[in-house]
């Protein structure tokens, strides 16, 4: 059972609709998703989902926001736990990879979306979307480390993109079903990130 999968009751219908919707899209595609079908799956009236989502696009946005919010919360926990430690970036990277490793359905849903926005600029925007918040945690902490290491401002953006590419690529490899690997991914992911997370001033 995946880490964040829960037993739902109608008192938490919004979250149940989101989780069921993610399952439907991953299994049969977005075109098969409807609020009426989700109501049936959740055992509630056809009108119940409209309390939370006026239309299908509202539900789709909420699904993405829901996943990124959970990831942001996990990254924030890691940041607080390892704050001021030299291996903070490694731990954050591991948290990112293992979050999707333990929640395949979230990963498959996110990569199927074409409306996810990630701000790769070195400047920090005031956007409040949860996908921006999750990435901003990685970006803020990486920037602190890079600046402390004497990395030039011009190079910081490139290094942040490279770091994100690393964890995103690792997540893809770990989740891909036809890749065989005998060792523990949880241990190996941290070792891999540590091996390439060497900050050199530019």
Regions found by a protein language model. Give the residues of each.
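N-terminal intrinsically disordered/low-complexity leader segments
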Residues: 1-12
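Generic hydrophobic, amphipathic alpha-helix propensity
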Residues: 13-22, 38, 63-71, 75, ...
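Helix-turn-helix
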Residues: 16, 20, 24-58, 62
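Hydrophobic alpha-helical connector segments
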Residues: 62, 76-105, 153, 160-163
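Amphipathic alpha-helical linker/stalk segments
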Residues: 65-91, 108, 122, 128, ...
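Amphipathic alpha-helical packing segments from all-alpha helical-bundle domains
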Residues: 75-76, 121-147, 157-161, 187-198
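Amphipathic C-terminal alpha-helical segment
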Residues: 102, 140, 144, 163-182, ...
């Amino acid at each position: 059972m995946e880490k964040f999968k829960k037993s739902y009751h109608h008192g938490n219908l919004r979250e149940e609709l989101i989780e069921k919707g993610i399952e439907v899209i991953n299994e049969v595609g977005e075109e098969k998703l409807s609020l009426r079908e989700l109501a049936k799956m959740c055992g509630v009236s056809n009108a119940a989902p409209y309390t939370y989502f006026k239309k299908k696009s509202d539900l789709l946005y909420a699904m993405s926001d829901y996943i990124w919010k959970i990831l942001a919360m996990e990254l924030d926990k890691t940041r607080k736990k390892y704050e001021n430690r030299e291996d903070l970036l490694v731990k954050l990277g591991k948290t990112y990879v293992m979050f999707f490793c333990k929640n395949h359905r979230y990963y498959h849903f996110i990569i199927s979306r074409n409306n996810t926005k990630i701000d790769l600029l070195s400047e920090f925007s005031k956007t409040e979307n949860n996908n921006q918040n999750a990435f901003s945690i990685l970006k803020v902490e990486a920037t602190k480390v890079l600046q402390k290491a004497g990395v030039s401002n011009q190079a910081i953006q490139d290094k942040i993109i490279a770091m994100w590419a690393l964890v995103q690529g690792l997540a893809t490899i770990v989740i891909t079903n036809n890749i065989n690997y005998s060792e523990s991914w949880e241990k190996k992911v941290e070792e891999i990130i540590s091996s390439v997370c060497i900050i050199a001033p530019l």
